[in-house]
């Protein structure tokens, strides 16, 4: 990071406890099929709207009111789990994810977060937004496993969170810098 006060940050939608519990059960069910994968703790899973990376204190302060306004303009929504997948789509998998079907309001919120990031001095994100929850990552090359159907149900998305991410040997630790209720 460029300065000691910088933080690694991202913007995400939080999940409800019911879906987190269902994700934990799904992970336990699929783990035997997924050799070499490191599964994320369910309490750390979220719907990332914009990864920021190194973020200065000034950028944090610029983003707070912009994210508050973006959250206020988006109503709470329901999202439906739509199955398991892997990135990349071909070859040796690196990431196991759970796809979400989300309403257009989530895409509008993601675009608002992108505009806020640009206004705070971040480069434009080149990768297209895909509504998904990262469940785990493979450490090494692995054969593509057959994935079972997954339908842990729906979740209510009602909170936008500006997170700090601290990387640790046992996994990342996410700390909210700010929370904003959708539609509030």
Task: For each feature predicted by the language model, list its residue ranges.
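Histidine-dependent nucleotide/RNA phosphoesterase domain, centered on the 2H-phosphoesterase fold
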Residues: 1-184
């Amino acid at each position: 990071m460029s300065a000691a006060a910088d933080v690694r940050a991202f913007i995400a939608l939080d999940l409800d406890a019911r879906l987190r519990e269902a994700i934990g059960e799904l992970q336990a069910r699929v783990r035997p099929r997924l050799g070499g994968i490191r599964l994320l703790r369910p309490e750390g899973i979220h719907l990332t709207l914009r990864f920021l990376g190194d973020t200065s204190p000034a950028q944090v302060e610029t983003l707070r009111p912009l994210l508050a306004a973006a959250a206020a303009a988006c109503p709470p929504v329901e999202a439906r789990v739509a199955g398991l997948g892997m990135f990349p789509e071909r070859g040796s998998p690196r990431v196991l994810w759970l796809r979400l079907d989300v309403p257009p309001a989530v895409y509008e919120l993601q675009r608002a977060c992108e505009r806020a990031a640009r206004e705070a001095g971040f480069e434009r994100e080149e990768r297209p937004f895909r509504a998904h929850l990262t469940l785990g990552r493979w450490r090494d090359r692995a054969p593509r496993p057959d994935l079972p159907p997954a339908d842990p149900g729906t979740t209510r998305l009602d909170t936008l969170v500006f997170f700090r991410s601290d990387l640790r040997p046992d996994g990342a630790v996410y700390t909210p810098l700010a929370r904003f209720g959708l539609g509030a």
